[in-house]
């Protein structure tokens, strides 16, 4: 199969019929074989009923329904797990991403042998203060910290080679940083393409200042995880051992000072330096334990269930 279209959504029932028809009109005009996978991330409107109707009328359309809202990253993860196309394209369900971009993204990723292409909404139809300015600040910080020079990390429309999305773990709120995750997995051929951004036609935006703040926190988390996520003992163990050694050395010095030098001086327990040394040793021990627990968590995380699927219109493996 040439293409898998992955569409995560939350309360977008009004948009789905138009979006689905638009995708079909664009792709039926090509010779590409494709599938469309909607992931309902715990919608409370009629989104799932609309997906069931689309599935009944088009055999290449599928749906996955979460038992509750788990977040966009988990929705993408579920879609990626089911995708079988050589190229996987993601887009949002709010009609602000134009399906007319899909054929061009497919042609370019194949022709230029890219690992992924990220969309760039160069001209936006969003609030200047509440979305455009925060988005520019966020993307600037992401570029500086990751070394990947994309203009729009959070753009919903992206195209990936299948091996890319099968090789990375999208977790937490890391959907914004899939290009960074891909680069750290060795997929460095990253392209960017200006895409059309349209004004929202139905519903209301899910964006808010809290998501903007979370984006920066996730960036810090990602930076740490990329360095130490698979080996937390390297970070916590090093600093824990260093702090314990410093604290122990200080306590040893105080003991030698009392026994051989300041014999008539204050008791060790009366000196504040002793409690500083003791605290440093305790913190070092706690850091070391944190590293050990982190190693246990890393070993177990692949066996944990990250989301619950309530219904599926596609065999889930």
Q: What are the residue ranges of the model-derived segments?
A:
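Cell-envelope/extracellular polymer assembly enzymes that use nucleotide-activated donors
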Residues: 2-4, 35
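Short, well-formed alpha-helical segments that are part of the catalytic scaffolds
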Residues: 12-27
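Acidic helix N-cap motif at the loop->helix transition within catalytic regions
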Residues: 14-18, 45-54
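Acceptor/aglycone-binding surface of glycosyltransferases and processive sugar-polymer synthases
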Residues: 53, 62-68, 72-82, 87, ...
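Hydrophobic helical membrane-anchoring modules
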Residues: 180-317
């Amino acid at each position: 199969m040439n293409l898998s279209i992955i569409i995560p959504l939350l309360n977008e029932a009004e948009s789905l019929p138009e979006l689905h028809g638009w995708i079909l009109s664009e792709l039926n005009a090509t010779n590409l074989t494709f599938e469309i996978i909607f992931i309902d991330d715990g919608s409370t409107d009629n989104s799932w009923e609309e997906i069931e109707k689309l599935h009944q009328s088009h055999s290449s359309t599928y749906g996955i329904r979460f038992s509750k809202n788990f977040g966009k990253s988990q929705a993408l993860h579920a879609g990626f797990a089911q995708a079988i196309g050589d190229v996987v394209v993601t887009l949002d369900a709010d009609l602000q991403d134009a399906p007319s971009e899909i054929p061009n993204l497919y042609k370019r990723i194949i022709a230029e042998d890219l690992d992924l292409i990220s969309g760039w909404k160069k001209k936006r139809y969003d609030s200047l203060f509440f979305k455009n300015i925060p988005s520019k600040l966020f993307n600037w910080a992401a570029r500086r910290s990751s070394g990947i020079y994309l203009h729009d990390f959070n753009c919903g429309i992206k195209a990936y080679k299948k091996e890319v999305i099968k090789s990375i773990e999208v977790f937490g709120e890391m959907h914004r940083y899939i290009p960074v995750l891909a680069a750290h997995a060795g997929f460095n051929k990253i392209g960017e393409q200006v895409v059309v951004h349209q004004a929202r036609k139905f519903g209301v935006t899910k964006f808010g200042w809290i998501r903007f703040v979370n984006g920066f926190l996730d960036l810090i988390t990602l930076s740490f995880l990329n360095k130490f996520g698979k080996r937390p003992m390297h970070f916590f163990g090093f600093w824990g051992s260093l702090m314990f050694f410093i604290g122990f050395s200080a306590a040893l010095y105080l003991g030698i000072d009392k026994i051989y030098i300041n014999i008539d001086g204050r008791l060790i327990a009366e000196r504040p330096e002793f409690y500083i040394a003791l605290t440093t040793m305790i913190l070092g021990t706690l850091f070391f334990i944190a590293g050990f627990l982190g190693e246990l968590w890393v070993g177990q995380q692949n066996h944990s269930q990250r989301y619950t699927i309530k219904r599926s219109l596609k065999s889930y493996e």
